C-alpha cells in the first residue's frame, strides 16, 4: 500500500462499513508493512501551566469559562520541569511532553520554554510541547532550542468544529501546524472522539489529517473524558468498537505515523486496549495522569505489555535497530526499578 494524501470522505465511510474483523486484518497488514510489530513508544506528559485558559473548548476542564475542580497554577519553574522529566525517563518514557493551558504563549514565556526544551534534551529524551497557537517566529524559537515535536490537535471535522470551540478557528489550527512544519519540527496532531459528532465528522477529521502535505508523525486519538462542570459532561459514551475502528482507519490512512492511544485509556479494559494495538496503535502516554484526567498506572501498563508481548521503546531508535533481548532486559529493569508515582504526571486530552 502506498502513502496517500488524497483521501475522500466516501473512502473513509467505506472503511467504516467494513466488517470489523476484515478492517482489523487490513490495518494489521498495513501496520506490519510500515511499522515494527509488538513495539509501543512511550511518552509522559506534564502540565507546566494548568487552568485559567481563556478559550471555550467544551471538552476541557482547564477553561476559565467552566466551573471544575482544576486548581490553577502558574508556569512551572524550569527546575521542577527537569526533575519531572528525569523521573519520567527513569520510569521508561522516551519522550517528554510539556503542555500549557494557553491560547498562545506570550513572548515573556519563550525564554523559560526554551530552557525547558534544552534541559530535557540534555537528558537524552525526545521533547514535545503543546502551548496553543504559534506565530512563525515562536515556532522557529522552539525549533532552534531543539524541540522535536509540537502537538496541536484539529479536534474534529471542520463542519462540527464550531459546536465545540469558538475562540479560535479551524484555519488557526491549520496555520499553526504549517508554522511548525516550516520551522522544521515534527507534528503531533489528532482529535477527540465522543463529543457528539457524527460518523461523517469522524471521517472528516481523518481526511483532514491524512490529506495534509506531510502526515503528522504522531496522531493521538483521544476518547473524550467527561469532566463534571464542562458542557460535555452528559454526552453519550463512545461505542468501543467504533473507537477501535477509527484507530484501524487512522493506521490505514497514515501508515507511517505513530497512532497514539491518548486520553480515555483509563476507561478502556485490557481487551479494548489490546484490540487498539491490534488495529495499529503503537504509542501511549505513560504515567498516573494526563493533563487533567486519569491515565493507567505504570504498573498496569507494564503488566498489559508483558501479557501481550509488547516492548516499549527505551530510546529514539527504529525498533529494528535495537536487539530484541536488549529491549526485554530494559522492560524487566523498568518493572523492578520503577519510582513511585508522582502527581506531576498528567494525562493528555489536548
UniProtKB/Swiss-Prot annotation:
Keyword match Iron-sulfur: yes
UniProt-recorded Gene Ontology molecular function terms: 2 iron, 2 sulfur cluster binding; 4 iron, 4 sulfur cluster binding; biotin synthase activity; iron ion binding
Residues at which [4Fe-4S] cluster binds: 53, 57, 60
Documented EC number(s): 2.8.1.6
Cofactor note as given: Binds 1 [4Fe-4S] cluster. The cluster is coordinated with 3 cysteines and an exchangeable S-adenosyl-L-methionine. Binds 1 [2Fe-2S] cluster. The cluster is coordinated with 3 cysteines and 1 arginine.
Known pathway: Cofactor biosynthesis; biotin biosynthesis; biotin from 7,8-diaminononanoate: step 2/2
Protein residues bound to [2Fe-2S] cluster: 97, 128, 188, 260
Gene3D superfamilies: Aldolase class I (3.20.20.70)
InterPro entries per record: Aldolase_TIM, BATS_dom, Biotin_synth/BioAB, Biotin_synthase, Elp3/MiaA/NifB-like_rSAM, rSAM
Positions of the Radical SAM core domain: 38-256
GO-annotated biological processes: biotin biosynthetic process
Any Pfam family: BATS
Cofactor requirement: [4Fe-4S] cluster; [2Fe-2S] cluster
Function comment: Catalyzes the conversion of dethiobiotin (DTB) to biotin by the insertion of a sulfur atom into dethiobiotin via a radical-based mechanism.
Subunit architecture: Homodimer.
Similarity comment text for this entry: Belongs to the radical SAM superfamily. Biotin synthase family.
Protein known as: Biotin synthase
Amino acid at each position: 500500500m502506498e502513502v496517500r494524501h488524497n483521501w475522500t470522505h466516501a473512502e473513509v465511510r467505506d472503511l467504516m462499513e467494513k466488517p470489523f474483523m476484515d478492517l482489523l486484518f487490513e490495518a494489521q497488514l498495513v501496520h506490519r508493512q510500515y511499522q515494527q510489530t509488538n513495539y509501543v513508544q512511550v511518552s509522559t506528559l506534564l502540565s507546566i501551566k494548568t487552568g485559567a485558559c481563556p478559550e471555550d473548548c467544551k471538552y476541557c476542564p482547564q477553561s476559565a469559562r467552566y466551573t471544575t475542580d482544576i486548581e490553577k497554577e502558574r508556569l512551572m519553574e524550569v527546575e521542577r520541569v527537569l526533575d519531572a522529566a528525569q523521573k519520567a525517563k527513569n520510569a521508561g518514557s522516551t519522550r517528554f511532553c510539556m503542555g500549557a493551558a494557553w491560547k498562545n504563549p506570550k513572548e515573556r514565556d519563550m525564554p523559560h520554554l526554551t530552557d525547558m526544551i534544552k534541559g530535557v534534551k540534555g537528558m537524552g529524551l525526545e521533547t514535545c510541547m503543546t502551548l496553543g497557537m504559534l506565530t512563525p517566529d515562536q515556532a522557529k524559537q522552539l525549533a532552534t532550542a531543539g524541540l522535536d515535536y509540537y502537538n496541536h490537535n484539529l479536534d474534529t471535522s471542520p463542519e462540527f468544529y464550531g459546536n465545540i470551540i469558538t475562540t479560535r478557528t479551524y484555519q488557526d489550527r491549520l496555520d499553526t501546524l504549517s508554522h511548525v512544519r516550516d520551522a522544521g519540527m515534527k507534528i503531533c496532531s489528532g482529535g477527540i472522539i465522543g463529543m457528539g459528532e457524527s460518523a461523517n465528522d469522524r471521517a472528516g477529521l481523518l481526511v483532514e489529517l491524512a490529506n495534509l502535505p506531510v502526515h503528522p508523525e504522531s496522531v493521538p486519538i483521544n476518547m473524550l473524558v467527561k469532566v463534571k462542570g464542562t458542557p460535555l459532561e452528559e454526552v453519550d459514551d463512545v461505542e468501543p468498537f467504533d473507537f477501535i475502528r477509527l484507530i484501524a482507519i487512522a493506521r490505514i490512512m497514515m501508515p507511517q505515523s505513530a497512532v497514539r492511544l491518548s486520553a480515555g485509556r483509563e476507561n478502556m479494559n485490557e481487551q479494548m486496549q489490546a484490540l487498539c494495538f491490534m488495529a495499529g496503535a503503537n504509542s501511549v502516554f505513560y504515567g498516573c495522569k494526563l493533563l487533567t484526567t486519569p491515565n493507567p498506572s505504570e504498573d498496569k501498563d507494564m503488566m498489559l505489555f508483558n501479557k501481550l508481548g509488547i516492548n516499549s521503546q527505551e530510546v529514539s531508535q527504529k525498533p529494528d535497530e535495537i536487539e530484541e533481548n536488549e529491549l526485554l532486559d530494559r522492560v524487566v529493569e523498568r518493572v523492578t526499578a520503577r519510582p513511585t508515582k508522582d502527581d506531576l504526571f498528567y494525562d493528555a486530552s489536548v
